[in-house]
Amino acid sequence: MMTHWPSPAKLNLFLYITGQRADGYHTLQTLFQFLDYGDTLHIEPRHDGEIHLLTPVNGVENEDNLIVRAARLLMKVASESGRLPAGSGADISIEKRLPMGGGLGGGSSNAATVLVALNHLWQCGLSIDELATLGLTLGADVPVFVRGHAAFAEGVGEILTPVNPPEKWYLVAHPGVSIPTPVIFKDPQLPRNTPKRSIDTLLKCEFSNDCEVIARKRFREVDAALSWLLEYAPSRLTGTGACVFAEFDTESCARQVLEQAPEWLNAFVAKGVNLSPLHRELL
């Protein structure tokens, strides 16, 4: 039986770099909110223990794809703890709408959806806490997608506090470039000492993103996208880019600006939601 699972985008409504650990990882404070927009995973259970990705990504070996890695990780851990029914496997395909290197969390969201969906379909019975712990081994952003609620994140992004920011409408624009996260985090001019603040203080301040100055400097397309969008509404970078976004109180206001978007921008309008569309499906 084929099943369909949302794999939503996220926005970093703010992102501040508060330090760098001895292992090279950066500590941060960020606010995650989901979008009612994203990829869709199609999963059909198999009964021969095989994992097949039917929609390979150009330039990425299947076994390196986060979708396959997440499936194999769940299979391994559930098997070792005696919670994997014999023969559990899956055929997985993806309808991809989220750009790679866009700062929307596409790969992390895909991995989280696989963990949540296969845990359900295989009836492994792992808790959300267990799935989030597995997810963290795949990427720092995976746990927030596994938990499925908007959150204030600290540490390297793994310390999550559920929050309920206003659910605005957003115009999200991709300027046609892919930004690998290390390009931003390795830049010597990246701000790395923004003072840590409480969530209550941060929610009262104007939101910004410490990575934005580097992304604008190194990628003229990002600079051009923000320059255009700022003419209409407060706008900023999400994650390490390349996507930028502006917030609006109504869908109609966002769509009016979308109609003005230049042809070189790939833009869409979506609602910010505090409960992930993936978890809404499970209710």
Swiss-Prot record:
It comes from the Bacteria. The active site is at K10, D141. GO terms for biological process: isopentenyl diphosphate biosynthetic process, methylerythritol 4-phosphate pathway; terpenoid biosynthetic process. Keywords: ATP-binding, Isoprene biosynthesis, Kinase, Nucleotide-binding, Transferase. ATP binds at P99, M100, G101, G102, G103, L104, G105, G106, G107, S108, S109. InterPro entries: GHMP_kinase_C_dom, GHMP_kinase_C_sf, GHMP_kinase_N_dom, IspE, Ribosomal_Su5_D2-typ_SF, Ribsml_uS5_D2-typ_fold_subgr. Pathway: Isoprenoid biosynthesis; isopentenyl diphosphate biosynthesis via DXP pathway; isopentenyl diphosphate from 1-deoxy-D-xylulose 5-phosphate: step 3/6. Its EC number is 2.7.1.148. It catalyses: 4-CDP-2-C-methyl-D-erythritol + ATP = 4-CDP-2-C-methyl-D-erythritol 2-phosphate + ADP + H(+). It is an enzyme of class 2 (transferase). The keyword Nucleotide-binding applies. GO terms for molecular function: 4-(cytidine 5'-diphospho)-2-C-methyl-D-erythritol kinase activity; ATP binding. Catalyzes the phosphorylation of the position 2 hydroxy group of 4-diphosphocytidyl-2C-methyl-D-erythritol. Belongs to the GHMP kinase family. IspE subfamily. Homodimer. PANTHER family: 4-DIPHOSPHOCYTIDYL-2-C-METHYL-D-ERYTHRITOL KINASE, CHLOROPLASTIC. This is 4-diphosphocytidyl-2-C-methyl-D-erythritol kinase. It comes from Salmonella typhimurium (strain LT2 / SGSC1412 / ATCC 700720). The lineage of its organism: Bacteria, Pseudomonadati, Pseudomonadota, Gammaproteobacteria, Enterobacterales. The gene is ispE.
